[in-house]
Amino acid sequence: MTNKCLLQIALLLCFSTTALSMSYNLLGFLQRSSSFQCQKLLWQLNGRLEYCLKDRMNFDIPEEIKQPQQFQKEDAALTIYEMLQNIYAIFRQDLSSTGWNETIVENLLANVYHQIDHLKTILEEKLEKEDFTRGKFVSSLHLKRYYGRILHYLKAKEYSHCAWTIVRVEILRNFFFINKLTGYLRN
């Protein structure tokens, strides 16, 4: 009797997990929560912007990110996925001049990686089941150029403390836009 009950519970949990993983509502909730945590971690990194104003740079985030127009769920998820991959790559650069707490940076990277992994799983499931065509997905090329400008800036400034402070603020802006895109993940 107990084994039968345990089997039913296990099957129910497996089914629930699969059903939930397909839900963009759940993805939106998890994404919002994780993005908030990333923003919190970024604020904990030291660096006073007022000392670095001379190093300011307009990285020119793609207009489709700043003012998204009727994204489909899949488009928003793919855009967020690509943004997070690039954010992860940026924070894997030389951070030695920042004086940042390594634990905070590691937590940030772990959180971003977790978001990427979760998005990848959901997207793979969706893409397998549906005939997917990219609608208003922000061009990968636009995003690559944008993040390329950030990486070039860091390199040109020799990964200085002020350069990282400016980039940290830019990545905080990214999470604002990611949260905006997350609104398109509702079922």
From Swiss-Prot:
GO biological process, one term: defense response to virus
Signal peptide positions on this chain: 1-21
Gene3D superfamilies: 1.20.1250.10
UniProt KW Glycoprotein keyword: yes
Localization per record: Secreted
Residues carrying Phosphotyrosine: Y24
GO cellular-component term (any): extracellular space
GO molecular function: cytokine activity; cytokine receptor binding
Glycosylation-annotated residues: N101
Xref: Pfam families: Interferon
Keywords attached to this entry: Antiviral defense, Cytokine, Disulfide bond, Glycoprotein, Phosphoprotein, Secreted, Signal
Keyword Repressor (UniProt): no
Top-rank taxon: Eukaryota
Bridged cysteine pairs (disulfide): C52-C162
UniProt xrefs under PANTHER family: INTERFERON BETA, TYPE I INTERFERON
Entry's family note: Belongs to the alpha/beta interferon family.
Function in brief: Type I interferon cytokine that plays a key role in the innate immune response to infection, developing tumors and other inflammatory stimuli. Signals via binding to high-affinity (IFNAR2) and low-affinity (IFNAR1) heterodimeric receptor, activating the canonical Jak-STAT signaling pathway resulting in transcriptional activation or repression of interferon-regulated genes that encode the effectors of the interferon response, such as antiviral proteins, regulators of cell proliferation and differentiation, and immunoregulatory proteins.
Subunit structure: Monomer.
Protein name: Interferon beta
Protein's organism: Macaca fascicularis
Organism phylogeny: Eukaryota, Metazoa, Chordata, Craniata, Vertebrata
